[in-house]
């Protein structure tokens, strides 16, 4: 078969609707692989820190669901390239993903993944299971391995509500795919080691969504306190973390007003205790 550019539009539509392929990326890979990101690109040299990188994402389960939050800073080496980048994306009504690593590649992957899930639902008449969604994302990450070896690394964090357990599930990845299911909480990005240490002390099983939101904001604050690539709450510009919660009611991104209220609670507490809440020993 010739190039997709040689086919009339009507034939392309016929192939699309009658291919029987439930994976959008597999369909494009079969008929027009050059349209997939990174498939025909070769860099003369690794890009290193010359392009913006997204940093810290945190997620934790709560009673009846899961919450994910991300800071807003993007860096190019030692330069702050963007102060209000969004790194947490809705992927369908009951799932979301956050990105760390090469920002542009991560954003492109998030958009393509959302189309992937929508395409499956249209072709099959049902949604993928949570494990199926996690595996589809792993396949996309493996597809980016060539670019990752040249420096365009993307490592996402995936979270979803699972009706089978009436609760949230979290999946981490590496550059080769995965997925690796995480229990209770997880963090990725340059500030993840500090955020995870904070979560280890502050996380409480079956806490309310509101309590988990506060826990995640504390974790991002701790990450920003020790990692220069992670942005803390920007009070002067009123730039707050992106926070999303997923329950049986679906995906809900908290408004700036809602997040701002939680941030003020955290900042007030930090004024009297700069290192944050102290976990009880007993």
From Swiss-Prot:
Catalytic reaction(s) noted: Cleavage of peptide bonds with very broad specificity
GO cellular component terms, semicolon-separated: cytoplasm; proteasome core complex, beta-subunit complex
EC number(s) from the headed UniProt entry: 3.4.25.1
Compartments where located: Cytoplasm
GO MF annotation list: threonine-type endopeptidase activity
Enzyme class name: hydrolase
GO biological process: modification-dependent protein catabolic process; proteasomal protein catabolic process
SUPFAM superfamilies, sorted: N-terminal nucleophile aminohydrolases (Ntn hydrolases)
Propeptide feature ranges: 1-54
Protein function: Component of the proteasome core, a large protease complex with broad specificity involved in protein degradation.
Family, per entry: Belongs to the peptidase T1B family.
Official protein name in the record: Proteasome subunit beta
Naturally occurring in which organism (per UniProt): Streptosporangium roseum (strain ATCC 12428 / DSM 43021 / JCM 3005 / KCTC 9067 / NCIMB 10171 / NRRL 2505 / NI 9100)
């Amino acid at each position: 078969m010739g190039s997709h550019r040689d086919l009339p539009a009507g034939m392309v539509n016929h192939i699309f609707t009658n291919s029987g392929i439930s994976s959008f990326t597999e369909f494009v890979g079969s008929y027009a692989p050059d349209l997939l990101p990174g498939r025909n690109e070769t860099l003369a040299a690794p890009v290193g820190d010359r392009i913006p990188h997204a940093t810290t994402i945190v997620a934790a389960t709560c009673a009846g669901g899961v919450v994910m939050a991300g800071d807003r800073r993007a860096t190019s080496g030692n330069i702050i390239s963007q102060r209000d980048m969004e790194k947490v994306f809705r992927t369908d009504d009951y799932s979301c993903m956050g990105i760390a690593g090469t920002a542009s590649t991560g954003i492109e992957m998030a958009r393509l993944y959302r189309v992937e899930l929508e395409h499956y639902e249209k072709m099959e008449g049902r949604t993928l299971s949570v494990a199926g969604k996690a595996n589809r994302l792993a396949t996309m990450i493996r597809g980016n391995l060539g670019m990752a070896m040249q420096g365009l690394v993307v490592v996402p964090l995936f979270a979803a509500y699972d009706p089978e357990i009436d609760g949230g599930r979290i999946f981490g990845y590496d550059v080769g795919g995965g997925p690796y299911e995480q229990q209770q909480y997880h963090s990725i990005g340059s500030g993840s080691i500090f955020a995870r240490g904070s979560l280890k002390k502050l996380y409480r099983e079956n806490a309310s969504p509101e309590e988990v939101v506060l826990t995640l904001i504390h974790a991002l604050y701790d990450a920003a306190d020790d990692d220069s690539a992670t942005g803390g709450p920007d009070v002067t510009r009123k730039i707050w973390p992106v926070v999303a919660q997923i329950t049986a009611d679906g995906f809900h991104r908290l408004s700036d007003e809602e997040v701002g209220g939680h941030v003020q609670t955290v900042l007030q507490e930090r004024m009297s205790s700069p290192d944050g809440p102290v976990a009880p020993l007993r």
